[in-house]
């Protein structure tokens, strides 16, 4: 169908208006979607990176369902995934923190397909927000709890378990996907400022950051929401190693800045325009 035949979704229009408002106000780390109310994740409710047989069975079922669901989205052209640029940068590392921009509920599965294509011998775990683990019902909740997820928590004791799991995941040569932008803005094309937590984890565990920035382009297709279906292209950068001759704060900031530089340079190269935000201060 053409865009004239499908009215644009009022919900999506409201989200875009909210994104524009938050950009003007510099509120880059705040979510714009109406997520379900969340609750605190307690330490006795989770065994991070659980390798018990029952957990492995749930993991296998969850990944099977997720792969089928994602395949169906691609078959129906609701998501169009293009060839990854720089795949060799991920194939050659052992443990690593992978960073990525966050713009779609399924972008972590875009990253799973990228990881699979790299032929990396280990697993990719993903850090998710607390409410995604505790409060999503049904099918999505099952995926959130069983697809190699490491949920954050507002409970201090749970966070201690989380950090121990991060150390184990990286020490075993696995990769850890983190969204340091912290917020998800639907199909937002610009890179957002990055929070420091991901870079602290890389520094503490002596592993590199492999930055990824996913660009998008309007296809000729129009989705059910009245907006053009996007063609997504993942761009992987060379591993960024911590400079351990620097103080920890300086080394962390260097990792963060180099990752931001990669995202900005990729944005400006692909879109052919300088990165500018419509903030009130600019």
Where do the language-model regions lie?
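Catalytic core of membrane glycerolipid acyltransferases/transacylases, capturing the structured
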Residues: 92-156
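Short, flexible loop segments at the rims of nucleotide/cofactor-binding pockets, characterized by
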Residues: 73-78, 152-157, 187-189
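Short amphipathic alpha-helical segments and helix-helix/interface helices
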Residues: 70, 116, 141, 166, ...
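Membrane-anchoring hydrophobic helices of lipid-metabolizing enzymes
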Residues: 2-112, 145-146
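Short, structurally constrained coil/turn elements
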Residues: 76-78, 92, 120, 172, ...
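Conserved beta-strand scaffold positions in the cores of enzyme catalytic domains, especially
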Residues: 84, 126, 149-151, 209-211, ...
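Structural motif corresponding to alpha-helix initiation and N-cap regions
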Residues: 84-87, 137, 160-163
């Amino acid at each position: 169908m053409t865009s004239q035949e499908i009215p644009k979704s009022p919900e999506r229009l409201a989200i875009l208006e909210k994104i524009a408002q938050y950009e003007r106000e510099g509120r880059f780390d705040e979510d714009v979607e109406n997520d379900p109310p969340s609750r605190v994740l307690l330490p006795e409710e989770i065994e991070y990176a659980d390798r018990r047989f029952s957990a492995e069975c749930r993991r296998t079922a969850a990944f099977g369902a997720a792969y089928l669901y994602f395949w169906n989205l691609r078959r129906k052209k609701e998501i169009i995934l293009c060839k990854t640029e720089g795949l060799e940068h991920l194939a050659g590392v052992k443990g690593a923190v992978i960073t990525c921009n966050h713009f779609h509920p399924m972008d972590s599965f875009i990253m799973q397909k990228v990881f699979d294509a790299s032929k990396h011998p280990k697993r990719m775990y993903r850090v998710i927000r607390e409410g995604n683990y505790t409060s999503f019902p049904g099918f999505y909740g099952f995926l959130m709890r069983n697809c190699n997820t490491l949920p954050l928590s507002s409970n201090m004791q749970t966070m201690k378990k989380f950090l121990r799991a991060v150390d184990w995941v990286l020490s075993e040569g696995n990769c850890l996907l983190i969204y340091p932008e912290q917020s998800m803005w639907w199909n937002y094309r610009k890179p957002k400022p990055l929070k420091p937590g991901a870079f602290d984890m890389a520094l503490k565990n002596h592993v590199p950051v492999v930055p990824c920035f996913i660009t998008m382009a309007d296809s000729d297709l129009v989705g059910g929401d009245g907006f053009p279906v996007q063609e997504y292209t993942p761009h992987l950068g060379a591993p960024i190693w911590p400079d351990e001759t620097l103080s920890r704060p300086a080394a962390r900031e260097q990792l963060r800045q180099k990752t931001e530089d990669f995202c900005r340079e990729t944005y400006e190269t692909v879109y052919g325009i300088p990165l500018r935000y419509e903030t009130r201060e600019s």
